[in-house]
Amino acid sequence: MARVTVEDCIDKVENRFELVLLASHRARLISQGSSITIDRDNDKNPVVALREIADETLSPDDLKEDLIHSLQKHVEIDEPEPDPASLLAAGGNASASGDEEEDAPEAVTFDQMSEEELLAGIEGLVPPEKSDDY
């Protein structure tokens, strides 16, 4: 049964190594209690996962994204970029205020932090959780 299922899955996921990763991830999800989308027919979890991929009840792209998300330790949060129209409006007001500022080179300034503020920030940090990776 599994051989026929794998041959059906190669049409959906061309790389057989990626197919193994996706099917094993899905089989682990099933063993953790995730609901299955097809009839089990007394098959084991890896065979059920392969049949789900072959029957296209699950998208391989969705499985791939879920696998990547499960392996990530640090998730980056995309912060919204400032609106270009508001930047132009703010820049236009500054240049209209005086012509002398336009000729002078623009000075780059950074936020200044005192040593006490830095130490208070460091003391407020929470140590990372211990993991078995080390």
Curated annotation (Swiss-Prot):
According to the UniProt record, one GO cellular component term is: DNA-directed RNA polymerase complex
Q: Which domain of life is it from?
A: Bacteria
EC number(s) per entry = 2.7.7.6
GO molecular function terms attached to this record:
DNA binding; DNA-directed RNA polymerase activity
Top-level class of the enzyme under EC nomenclature: transferase
SMART domains, alphabetically?
Answer: RNA_pol_Rpb6
| Region of interest (Disordered), residue spans | 77-108
User: Keywords in UniProt for this one?
Assistant: DNA-directed RNA polymerase, Nucleotidyltransferase, Transcription, Transferase
Q: Which reaction does it catalyse?
A: RNA(n) + a ribonucleoside 5'-triphosphate = RNA(n+1) + diphosphate
Q: Where is the composition biased (Low complexity)?
A: 85-97
One Gene Ontology BP term is:
DNA-templated transcription
Summary of subunit composition and partner proteins: The RNAP catalytic core consists of 2 alpha, 1 beta, 1 beta' and 1 omega subunit. When a sigma factor is associated with the core the holoenzyme is formed, which can initiate transcription.
Q: What does this gene product do?
A: Promotes RNA polymerase assembly. Latches the N- and C-terminal regions of the beta' subunit thereby facilitating its interaction with the beta and alpha subunits.
Family, as annotated: Belongs to the RNA polymerase subunit omega family.
The name this protein carries in UniProt is DNA-directed RNA polymerase subunit omega
Q: Which gene encodes it?
A: rpoZ
